[in-house]
Curated annotation (Swiss-Prot):
Region (Disordered): 278-304, 414-441
GO cellular component, one term: plasma membrane
UniProt xrefs under Gene3D superfamilies: alix/aip1 like domains
Protein name, as recorded: pH-response regulator protein palC
Family (UniProt): Belongs to the palC family.
BRO1 domain: residues covered: 3-352
Protein role: Required for the proteolytic cleavage of the transcription factor RIM101 in response to alkaline ambient pH.
Listed InterPro entries: BRO1_dom, BRO1_sf, pH-resp_palC
Pfam family, one: BRO1
Length: 441
């Protein structure tokens, strides 16, 4: 599991812009774009072959190639009036979310708008990949850099969603727009990145606590932030992942479990299966739903596409809810509500019990530390309650009804692409056009 989902980084087929576009005054812009795009293609191929997208990989060459190409393609897109399109542009890309196999076919996309959007899309995913690679590094500034790149990736996606090329695509018949490039998918990606940026705060606070001497004792908070703020931050992150899942069309029934044992009174919460299937003492009260059945449910949604992304969002929600209960427990302990602290810490442990992360994952150590912290907290709280307080321990479902509203603490970073050509033309008009606009005469 990574700090954000990136799927398979897109790859693309050759495309000669100089054979499709001409200009009396700005032919050099087209030639520069051609050369830069060729480097993008080579770097994407190289990244795929060498595992550059892995946590220990190096995605920076891909990012640099994309940053070299974007000013040229942006100049052409923003100043179509000074370029002549001699033939229809057909650009072929292997889509990142639907192409779960490295051998999946590339999808032909008609028009310069699709080329531009795929470049921006790929750039956002590459930035998110770089953020994940920073998380995997054992360096003090890793969280700062990871947060910066996640925020920038979200800024790129938000720019993509507002730009004229995307509006052109959105006005095309739905059948001609791949699911990866739909408005709902891009909106979901923005929400996912927003949630990921807030999760980084929670991971950073836990990491700083460990630097101060290991798993904190019962009364210790993380990173010097108030438990109230971290609680609401975790809820906000969790809600962002929930919104992303809803935008991708995952049915509510797939995100929530209502059993005869526990019936949720609020549609706001989606606790893990084990929270509902265990008693407060930890003993099972109903047969748990198997991971196979859970995966089968996910794989049957969204017409067989985007399943890996939905699965990632489900796990991300689970970890976020673990943080919610953790900081709920700390807040309760600070307020001398020892029984509530015991119940919340135990709910967090159950929430994270099924979260299995490979050792090579960037989040293996942070989540392992989180689990260790929760076990120690629960033991400390329970010892205090058994010896001194003797307070009743609320169930996870009762605690869930007490969640406050989430709080956004990181704003979106505004991003705009550079251009290599500025003619001062008015490009503010967003009148709908078809995606092949300017493709041929």
């Amino acid at each position: 599991m990574s700090i954000s989902y990136t799927g398979q980084l897109p790859t693309t087929s050759p495309l000669s812009l100089t054979q499709l576009i001409t200009s009396d005054r700005y032919q050099q812009v087209i030639e520069n774009a051609d050369a830069a795009r060729a480097r993008v293609r080579e770097q994407l191929k190289h990244a795929k072959k060498t595992g550059a997208t892995e946590a220990n990989g190096d995605i920076m060459p891909v990012i640099k190639a994309l940053e070299e190409y974007m000013p040229h393609i942006t100049s052409i897109v923003d100043n179509e009036g000074v370029f002549r399109f001699t033939s229809q542009i057909i650009t072929c890309w292997r889509l990142p979310f639907q192409s779960q196999s490295s051998m999946a076919n590339k999808t032909p996309l008609h028009g310069l708008s699709f080329e531009y959007i795929m470049v921006l899309f790929t750039y956002a995913l590459a930035l998110a990949t770089l953020a994940n690679q920073y998380v995997a590094r054992d360096k003090e500034d890793r969280w700062k850099h990871a947060s910066a790149y996640i925020s920038k990736a979200r800024g790129v996606v938000d720019y993509l969603r507002q730009c004229r090329s995307f509006q052109i695509i959105c006005n095309e018949p739905p059948a001609s727009v791949p699911r990866d490039l739909s408005s709902a998918t891009m909106s979901a990606l923005s929400h996912m990145l927003c949630g990921a940026s807030h999760m980084l705060i929670l991971y950073k606070c836990d990491a700083e606590t460990y630097l101060d001497g290991g798993a904190p004792s019962a009364g210790a908070n993380s990173g010097g932030f108030s438990s109230s703020l971290l609680l609401r931050t975790a809820i906000f992150a969790r809600d962002q992942f929930e919104t992303a899942s809803a935008l991708l069309g995952e049915p509510v029934s797939k995100r929530k479990l209502v059993t005869s044992l526990v019936k949720e009174k609020s549609s706001k919460f989606s606790l893990s299966k084990k929270l509902h299937l265990r008693k407060d003492d930890g003993s099972p009260s109903l047969a748990p739903v198997s991971s196979f059945e859970s995966n089968r449910d996910l794989s049957s949604t969204s017409s067989g596409t985007l399943d890996s992304l939905l699965s990632w969002l489900s796990r991300a929600r689970g970890v976020a809810e673990g943080f919610v209960f953790k900081h709920m427990a700390i807040q309760a302990y600070e307020n001398n509500q020892i029984g509530k602290a015991v119940g919340a810490a135990y709910a967090a442990i159950l929430q994270l019990e099924d979260v299995k992360i490979p050792q090579k994952s960037a989040l293996y150590i942070p989540v392992t530390h989180l689990k260790e912290t929760l076990n120690r907290h629960h033991a400390d709280y329970k010892a205090d309650n058994d010896r001194l307080s003797f307070e009743p321990v609320p169930s996870p479902s009762e605690l869930a009804q007490e969640w406050p509203s989430g709080r956004q603490v990181i704003s979106a970073q505004k991003w705009t692409p550079q251009t290599s050509l500025d003619l001062g033309e008015d490009t503010s008009s967003s009148a709908p056009k078809y995606s092949g606009q300017g493709s041929y005469y």
